[in-house]
C-alpha cells in the first residue's frame, strides 16, 4: 500500500511538468510519431485522466490526516476520563470495604462478649429450671398438690351423692313404712304363687305325655289302616268284576292313599308341635328355676333385713346412717318383690296360653281319632274295608284344613323372632345395659327400634309375646321371643 501511495504522489507531482512539455513539444512528437493526427486527442485524454487520479489521491490523504488530528485527542480524553472514573470507583469501594470490615469486627467482638456471658449464664439457667421442676412436682404430687385436691374433691362428691341418696331413701322409707308392715303377707303370697307355678308346670308335663300317647295311638291306627288297605287290594283280585266296580275301587284306593298321606303329614306336624311345646316348656322351666332362685335369694335378704329392723327397733342408740342404709335396701327389695310379682303374673299368663293351646290340640286329636275309629258292627262282611275307607275319606278337605291350622299355629306361636345383632343372652343383656336399664327393667318398642334400627320386626309380631299387654317387654319376654 505504501508503494502505491508513493507512486500516486510521484504521478501527481509529475503531472504539471508533463502538461507543460506536451504544450511545448507537441509538434516534435507529432513529427516523430507514425500515428495519424487523430491520436493526439487520445493521448491528451489519457493524460487528463491520469492527472485527475493524482488530484484525487492528494485529497484523500489530506482528509485522513485531518481525521487523525481530531480523533486521537478525543480518544485519549475518553480513555483518561475512564481511568479517572475507575480510580474514583476503586477508592470508593475500598472505603466502603473498610467500613464494612470495621462493622464486622465490632459485631464479632460483641458476639464473643455475648458468648462469654452466655457460657456464664447457662449453669444459672439450669439451676433455675431444676428448681422450677421441683416446684411443679410438689404442686402435682405433694401434700397440697393437684392430685390430692382432686382426690378430696371426688371424695366430697361421693359423700354428697351418698348423703342425697340417703335423704331420698329416708323420704321413701317414711312413705313405705306401711309396706314394711305387710311384708310377711307378701312373702306368704309369693310362696303360694311359687307352689301354684310348680303345680301348673306338672300339669303341663302330664298334658304333653298324654299328647304323646295319643300320637302313638294314632300311629297304630294308621298301621291298621294300611294293613286293611293291603287286604282290600288282595280281595280286589277276584274273577270277572264289572268295569264300573273296578273304576270305583281304583278311585277309592287313590283317595285312601291321599288320606293316608294327609294323615302322615298331620302326624308329623303334630310331632313337630309337641317338640316345640317341649322346647318352650323347657325354656319356661329354666326361666322359672332362675326366677325361683332369685326369689329365694331375695326372700332370704328380706328376712335378714326384717330381723335387722326388728333388732334396730329394740335398740334406741342406733345411728342414723345405718337406718338410712337399711331403709334403702328394704326399698330395693320391695321393688324387687314387685318385679318378681309381675314376672310371676306374666309366667302364669303364658302358662294359661300354653294350656289353652294344649286343649285345642287335644280337641283336634280327638277329631282325628273320631274320623279314624268308625264303628264296624253295622257293615256287611264283604264291604267293611271299602266302607271304612269311604267313611274315613268322606271329607278329604278336612285333613288339609287341619294341617293348615296346625301350620299357622306353629308359625304364629312357636316360631321365634330374630332381632338384628342379638343371638345370645349376653347380647340381650348388653342391649338392656345400652338403653340404661338393668335386666329387671322393661323396654318399649320405640326404645328397641332406636337402639337396633329399622331392621326391627313389626310391633304386631312382638305383641304376641307381650303377656300383660302394656306395650313394654321384659328380659324373659324378649328371651322367649328370640328363642334363646
From Swiss-Prot:
Binding site for Ca(2+): 466, 468, 470, 472, 477
Disordered: annotated span: 1-48, 227-255, 313-395
Superkingdom in the source lineage: Eukaryota
Coiled-coil boundaries: none
Residue ranges with Acidic residues bias: 37-48
InterPro entries from the UniProt entry: EF-hand-dom_pair (IPR011992), EFCAB14 (IPR042352)
PANTHER family in the cross-refs: EF-HAND CALCIUM-BINDING DOMAIN-CONTAINING PROTEIN 14 (PTHR15717:SF2), PROTEIN KIAA0494 (PTHR15717)
Protein name per the record: EF-hand calcium-binding domain-containing protein 14
Upper taxonomic lineage: Eukaryota, Metazoa, Chordata, Craniata, Vertebrata
Amino acid at each position: 500500500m505504501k508503494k502505491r501511495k508513493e507512486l500516486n504522489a510521484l504521478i501527481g507531482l509529475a503531472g504539471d511538468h508533463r502538461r507543460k512539455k506536451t504544450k511545448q513539444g507537441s509538434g516534435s512528437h507529432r513529427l516523430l510519431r507514425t500515428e495519424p493526427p487523430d491520436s493526439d486527442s487520445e493521448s491528451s485524454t489519457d493524460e487528463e485522466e491520469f492527472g485527475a487520479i493524482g488530484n484525487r489521491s492528494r485529497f484523500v490523504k489530506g482528509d485522513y490526516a485531518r481525521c487523525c488530528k481530531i480523533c486521537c485527542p478525543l480518544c485519549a480524553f475518553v480513555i483518561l476520563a475512564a481511568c479517572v472514573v475507575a480510580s474514583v470507583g476503586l477508592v470508593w469501594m475500598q472505603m466502603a470495604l473498610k467500613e464494612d470490615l470495621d462493622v464486622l469486627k465490632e459485631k464479632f467482638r460483641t458476639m464473643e462478649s455475648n458468648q462469654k456471658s452466655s457460657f456464664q449464664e447457662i449453669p444459672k439457667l439450669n439451676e433455675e429450671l431444676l428448681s422450677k421442676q421441683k416446684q411443679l412436682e410438689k404442686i402435682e404430687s405433694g401434700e397440697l398438690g393437684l392430685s390430692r385436691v382432686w382426690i378430696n374433691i371426688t371424695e366430697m362428691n361421693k359423700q354428697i351423692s351418698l348423703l342425697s341418696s340417703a335423704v331420698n331413701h329416708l323420704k321413701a322409707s317414711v312413705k313405705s313404712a306401711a309396706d314394711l308392715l305387710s311384708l310377711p303377707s307378701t312373702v306368704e303370697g309369693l310362696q303360694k304363687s311359687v307352689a301354684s307355678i310348680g303345680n301348673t308346670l306338672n300339669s303341663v308335663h302330664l298334658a304333653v305325655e298324654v299328647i304323646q300317647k295319643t300320637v302313638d295311638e294314632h300311629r297304630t291306627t294308621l298301621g291298621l289302616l294300611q294293613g286293611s288297605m293291603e287286604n282290600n287290594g288282595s280281595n280286589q283280585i277276584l274273577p270277572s268284576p264289572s268295569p264300573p266296580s273296578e273304576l270305583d275301587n281304583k278311585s277309592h284306593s287313590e283317595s285312601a292313599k291321599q288320606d293316608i298321606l294327609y294323615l302322615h303329614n298331620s302326624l308329623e306336624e303334630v310331632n313337630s308341635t309337641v317338640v316345640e311345646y317341649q322346647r318352650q316348656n323347657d325354656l319356661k322351666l329354666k326361666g322359672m328355676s332362675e326366677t325361683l332362685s332369685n326369689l329365694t335369694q331375695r326372700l332370704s335378704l328380706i328376712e335378714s333385713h326384717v330381723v335387722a329392723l326388728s333388732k334396730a327397733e329394740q335398740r334406741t342408740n342406733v345411728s342414723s346412717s345405718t337406718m338410712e342404709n337399711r331403709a334403702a335396701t328394704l326399698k330395693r327389695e320391695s321393688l324387687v318383690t314387685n318385679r318378681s310379682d309381675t314376672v310371676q303374673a306374666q309366667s302364669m299368663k303364658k302358662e294359661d296360653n300354653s294350656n289353652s293351646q294344649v286343649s285345642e290340640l287335644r280337641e283336634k286329636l280327638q277329631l282325628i281319632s273320631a274320623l279314624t275309629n268308625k264303628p264296624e258292627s253295622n257293615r256287611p262282611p264283604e264291604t267293611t274295608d271299602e266302607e271304612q275307607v269311604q267313611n274315613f275319606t268322606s271329607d278329604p278337605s278336612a285333613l288339609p284344613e287341619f294341617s293348615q291350622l296346625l301350620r299357622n299355629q306353629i308359625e304364629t306361636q312357636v316360631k321365634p323372632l330374630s332381632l338384628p345383632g342379638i343371638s345370645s343372652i349376653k347380647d340381650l343383656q348388653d342391649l338392656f345395659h345400652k338403653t340404661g336399664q338393668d335386666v329387671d327393667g322393661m323396654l318399649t318398642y320405640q326404645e328397641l327400634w332406636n337402639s337396633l334400627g329399622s331392621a326391627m320386626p313389626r310391633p304386631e309380631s312382638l305383641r304376641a309375646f307381650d303377656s300383660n299387654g302394656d306395650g313394654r317387654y321384659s328380659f324373659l319376654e324378649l328371651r322367649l321371643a328370640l328363642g334363646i
